[in-house]
Amino acid sequence: GIGKFLHSAGKFGKAFLGEVMKS
């Protein structure tokens, strides 16, 4: 469902932001 999609998107977003912050 949409909740599962949002959860996956949230995890991906956090990982992406983490990499951006490290740069």
Swiss-Prot record:
Has antimicrobial activity against Gram-negative bacterium E.coli ATCC 25922 (MIC=50 uM) and against fungus C.albicans ATCC 90028 (MIC=100 uM). Has no hemolytic activity against human erythrocytes even at high concentrations. It is found in: Secreted. Signal peptide: none annotated. Keywords: Antibiotic, Antimicrobial, Fungicide, Secreted. Expressed by the skin glands. GO terms for cellular component: extracellular region. Belongs to the gastrin/cholecystokinin family. Magainin subfamily. Its main location: secreted. The keyword Lipid metabolism does not apply. This is Magainin-B2. It comes from Xenopus borealis (Kenyan clawed frog). One of its GO terms (biological process) is defense response to bacterium. The lineage of its organism: Eukaryota, Metazoa, Chordata, Craniata, Vertebrata.
